[in-house]
């Protein structure tokens, strides 16, 4: 089963994937789709064109191509990625915990002290590919706050399910959640 949708002016078929017995989601994947990545980055930048911000910030992994393309198109020299684990090159990393609809159990997000120091006092736009329960977005926001940054906006390609009702995010397109038979909940 697939769900047909248009985002950033492009038509795509999203495979419908089981999360639980009564919850299925449309899998939005930019990996390997250069055309979609470029178009979504362009339109995400339009959402914040009047926003004063210093840096873009996301969590690995599916949003990495998007944030890179957003930086390329906007001329930004630096962006930040919260990692799912500490890396040897991260001096004195800080971290927060997160629960995501697509990740089993608790996941931690890490940021090296060097990046945290660059974020301190800066205006940050959080970006994610899909906002669903808001767990990943909340964890990113907590990590930015822990680093001393100021979140000025939250953007995503898609708002899934109840996230469409949120007033604190901007997004390019809505994405419903599905029943086992592929019908919209």
Annotate each predicted stretch with a short phrase.
Residues 1-53:
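Active-site-facing substrate-recognition patch
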Residues 129, 134:
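Conserved G/P- and acidic residue-centered "switch" motifs that form tight phosphate/ATP-binding loops
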Residues 77-124:
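Short, glycine/charge-rich flexible loops or terminal/linker lids adjacent to PRPP-binding catalytic cores
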Residues 2-4, 138-185:
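PRPP-dependent phosphoribosyltransferase catalytic core
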Residues 61, 84-86, 159-160:
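Short, ordered loop/turn segments at secondary-structure junctions
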Residues 65-74, 141:
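Short Gly/Thr/Asp-enriched flexible loops that form oxyanion-binding sites at enzyme active sites
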Residues 53-60:
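Short glycine-rich phosphate-binding loop at a beta-alpha junction
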Residues 54, 122, 152:
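Conserved acidic residues
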């Amino acid at each position: 089963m697939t769900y047909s949708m248009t985002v950033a002016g492009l038509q795509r078929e999203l495979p419908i994937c089981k999360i639980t017995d009564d919850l299925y989601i449309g899998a939005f994947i930019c990996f390997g789709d250069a055309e979609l990545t470029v178009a979504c980055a362009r339109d995400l930048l339009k959402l914040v064109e009047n926003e004063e911000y210093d840096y873009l910030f996301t969590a690995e992994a599916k949003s990495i191509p998007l944030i890179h393309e957003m930086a390329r198109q906007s001329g930004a020299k630096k962006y930040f990625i919260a990692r799912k684990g500490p890396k040897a090159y991260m001096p004195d990393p800080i971290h927060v915990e997160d629960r995501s609809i697509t990740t089993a159990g608790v996941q931690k997000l890490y940021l090296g002290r060097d990046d945290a120091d660059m974020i301190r006092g800066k205006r940050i736009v959080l970006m994610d590919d899909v906002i669903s329960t808001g767990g990943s977005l909340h964890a990113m926001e907590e990590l930015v706050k822990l680093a001393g940054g100021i979140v000025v906006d939250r953007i995503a390609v898609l708002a899934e399910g109840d996230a469409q009702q949120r007033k604190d995010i901007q997004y390019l397109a809505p994405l419903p959640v599905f029943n086992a038979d592929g019908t919209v909940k």
